[in-house]
Amino acid sequence: MQRSNHTVTEFILLGFTTDPGMQLGLFVVFLGVYSLTVVGNSTLIVLICNDSHLHTPMYFVVGNLSFLDLWYSSVYTPKILVICISEDKSISFAGCLCQFFFSAGLAYSECCLLAAMAYDRYVAISKPLLYAQAMSIKLCALLVAVSYCGGFINSSIITKKTFSFNFCCENIIDDFFCDLLPLVKLACGEKGCYKFLMYFLLASNVICPAVLILASYLFIITSVLRISSSQGRLKAFSTCSSHLTSVTLYYGSILYIYALPRSSYSFDMDKIVSTFYTEVLPMLNPMIYSLRNKDVKEALKKLLP
């Protein structure tokens, strides 16, 4: 730590444990999870690109979600693996900044993508005859582009504000990556304006997409209840089940960490929940979107010899 300018040149990531046996076990687990994430998401992207039956608005967005999950997991896992097997737990100031920027940008983008998918499901169920016109590839591309651009613009704002603080107290982060809350805890100076910005971005990038998702599902439920046959209603709900599962798991994790009152906040619980949405969920998403999907299964059969 450089005392002359009262800031730090690197941070120390404590990770999960200091026990060598546990660290080795965690290394094997995280390597296995990351391998499945890479294989699952890469396979889904290849299937969507290669099979003409999957060249639809829904799969266009699903493919982008797989790409995002692949990128998202890759932001964290290499450093986690190093922390698990190396005595050097440090990450440079620049490395921490980059990890923070990409993790925030991808998290914001995923919230918007999930909202776009909810709208896609609403159009598919409520206006099936006009689906191709209402959800054109151009519109899907625009929704994806807005999701990424909006996510990373907002990420650049919070990143610049976060790393403009002086970290003059300690450089030890009680986490396995450079997350917002542990960094804010280390920062010195007035944080009133920062907290306002933090909650504003939380509201605009997480809560607003969540409201849009809820609104879409309210309209979906209304449309489904108008379907006369029980088989038709079941098929309509089945169409939304994979997306609803993904939304519940992702938003449940995000809101638990960032919207929970500070009086009940725990860094240990934060690590567990963060592990779920940064490592486990990107691995599960390809399974969630493909296990019950006949089109994906057929495309996989064609791809395999």
Swiss-Prot record:
Residues 1-27, 86-96, 160-200, 261-271 are extracellular. It is found in: Cell membrane. Disulfide bonds join C96-C178. GO terms for molecular function: G protein-coupled receptor activity; olfactory receptor activity. The keyword Ribonucleoprotein does not apply. Glycans are attached at N5. Keywords: Cell membrane, Disulfide bond, G-protein coupled receptor, Glycoprotein, Membrane, Olfaction, Receptor, Sensory transduction, Transducer, Transmembrane, Transmembrane helix. The chain crosses the membrane at residues 28-48, 65-85, 97-117, 139-159, 201-221, 240-260, 272-291. Residues 49-64, 118-138, 222-239, 292-305 are cytoplasmic. It is a multi-pass membrane protein. SUPFAM superfamilies: Family A G protein-coupled receptor-like. Gene3D superfamilies: Rhodopsin 7-helix transmembrane proteins. Odorant receptor. This is Olfactory receptor 9G9. It comes from Homo sapiens. The lineage of its organism: Eukaryota, Metazoa, Chordata, Craniata, Vertebrata. The gene is OR9G9.
